[in-house]
């Protein structure tokens, strides 16, 4: 655990007592603060009280008179579509609102670092798609070369649950827009922006607010090194804003769609090969086609981002290349479940928006596509030019009929995962891929995308 610094003796309100909220409450108490907790769920309050925390509902502005700050869990709205009532009261009372990420950055560095040979560093990864794979890949490469590393944030452990860093350790954080939007302190040493597509728009008031939330990771003077995907206008703009000039190699531009040129530092993937250029000269080339854990061009972008981070941390190209080949990938992300009679079954349940699904569809030549669920803001436009490889779609979800009508391919309404897998497997021919890439949220039928992916794998197991 990382004890929270700078709040000893202060009363700190904690709103939301799930994994993140309880982690913050424990870290606050370990640092000498006095957590005052609340959750609308009585079971969550009971669990907190069993750990000795005081639970009190804050229902008036006057209730905040003696409170130093309010810590909010990421699932609780603080602005859009409307602030949670407790958040609104805190703002009216002039009480700062923060989250566990802000507490982490204010508490990460300690006096113990004076005895370290190499100061610990923080790598933070954000973006719409590819955050988890990029973060896990960075962590894997560092572990492969024997460098101490910890994976936390939106993946792995909570940021305040990790141990205080060791000499030379690298902490890799995956950060969502919910986390970057609210954190009062964001000071990573290396920051990564993978890409941007329409997602979570209700929580950010539109694309402008969504991009602004991601961009906050690069504020406060900026990180020592910024790795920025430039295949969308927002990334191109961000890289231009951060760089002092064309040759400023504090910004590493990455792409999986174009060859990058210029005197700066670039890493891009074309036709399955990753290339690194610096000051106009090629430094290295890596064949990504034979890396089993990174199928598809969308994963080549993740490889470019992870490669750029590790190069900025001083690792040699050949060392990084060797580590790429031992990466197994993540569950529910282009995950090969099995194969029978020449038909492959791939679980990409994490493809929860149209852009992510479009990238998954681009990875395979002949697809039996299982999709559907709760459609997200932003619509289905990204799928219009990505369906050439789809033989047929099998649509699940409570609103399967409406979802199917928006697809640019032949679609059959299946409603349940069991029906979809059974029909897709029965109709598939050798060379086909039965792909779960929902292009939608899971909450109409499942608790989360992991449960949806597990259901797919269980149904596939019956067929194999």
UniProtKB/Swiss-Prot annotation:
Keyword Magnesium: no
GO molecular-function term, one example from the UniProt record: UDP-N-acetylmuramoylalanine-D-glutamate ligase activity
Pfam families on file: Mur_ligase_C, Mur_ligase_M
Top-level EC class as recorded in UniProt: ligase
Binding site for ATP: 127-133
Alphabetical GO biological process terms: cell division; cell wall organization; peptidoglycan biosynthetic process; regulation of cell shape
Alphabetically ordered keywords of this record: ATP-binding, Cell cycle, Cell division, Cell shape, Cell wall biogenesis/degradation, Cytoplasm, Ligase, Nucleotide-binding, Peptidoglycan synthesis
Subcellular location: Cytoplasm
Gene Ontology terms: cellular component: cytoplasm
EC numbers: 6.3.2.9
Pathway recorded for this protein: Cell wall biogenesis; peptidoglycan biosynthesis
Keyword Cell division: yes
Reactions catalysed, as given in the entry: UDP-N-acetyl-alpha-D-muramoyl-L-alanine + D-glutamate + ATP = UDP-N-acetyl-alpha-D-muramoyl-L-alanyl-D-glutamate + ADP + phosphate + H(+)
NCBIfam families in the cross-refs: murD (TIGR01087)
Family: Belongs to the MurCDEF family.
Function in brief: Cell wall formation. Catalyzes the addition of glutamate to the nucleotide precursor UDP-N-acetylmuramoyl-L-alanine (UMA).
Cited HAMAP family: MurD
Protein name (record): UDP-N-acetylmuramoylalanine--D-glutamate ligase
Species annotation: Roseobacter denitrificans (strain ATCC 33942 / OCh 114) (Erythrobacter sp. (strain OCh 114))
Encoding gene per record: murD
